[in-house]
Amino acid sequence: MDKNFYNESSAKNLGWDPTWFGEKYYDDQLIRAIKKWQRERGLTADGLCGPATFRRIWTERQANIDAYKPKDVKYSNYIVYNGKFHKIEWPKVVLWSEKGGLQADKGTYYNYTGRAKRNVRLFVNHWDVCLNSESCMSILNKRGISVHFLIDNDGTIYQTLDMQHGAWHAGSAKVNRASVGVEISNAYYPKYQDWYKRNGFGERPIIHGARVHGKELEPFTGFYPVQIKALKALWRTIHNSTEVEYATPLSQFGTTSKNYEQDVKYGKFNGFISHYHVSKNKIDCAGLDIKTLLEEVVDEESRGFVDIGESCKDE
């Protein structure tokens, strides 16, 4: 592989340049600079600014920008599936067509307009390793991929395209065609706690001892409580509007599986999953106890109780 050619093409497609790594040209010095940057952050030091490296350096650069401002948006009470509106019990939902909405670019998803209603059997949970949902949407569009929903730091749910379309979010055409996905905003690395505090979100919980694919992860930032409440509201509406069942892959002990599950990827499962359930190379959303959260959703439904979160009330 011609690494100089790769980096120049990557820069053109994703929107970075050599100065991000302290260099001027697409040459061997840039390759060495990228390798050094990658090694310092525990990434594979190949000297190529691919999607993973780009996402990391993008987020680091965003953290140094103090011009963050909350979006001025128009809230809705619905999500959209095959052109039909389905009510969601959550006060902060923004559709791609509304003021302040975030939209997946054309050509970044399977467009099923005019076709029979898509059969959705999986809901895939991701974390975005970004500082906020707007930044995540920018990266997705730059990379030519997509996701149906984003959940921001304050619990705002953004829908970026109709669920009738197949978003490119799970790395597998088989999974993408049968699923809906969400990117939950979380920069993952504890060093970003200062950014969250500086911008009024407060500290995130730190997750210790989480395991995935048989390995224990280093401590990382977890989701805000309001994000979990938004996620549960979204799950409830997904279940009621699609064929997705209240189920998740389980371990031999009856707990949420922490491993890749082949049956899920190859169509033998219907329910709510984390990205790592369908990819051995992914760790999101480690620590997310889907089984327990689904039990809470079912219990709340049986009692007619909807928890919209303290930060969402009276707004």
Predicted regions and their residues:
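Catalytic-site microenvironment of enzymes
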Residues: 2-12, 65, 161, 286, ...
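N-terminal module-boundary/linker segments of secreted carbohydrate-active enzymes
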Residues: 55-117, 122-124
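Basic/polar, cationic surfaces and motifs that engage anionic cell-wall
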Residues: 60, 69-81, 188, 192-315
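Active-site-adjacent loop/helix surface patches within enzyme catalytic domains
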Residues: 95-240, 244
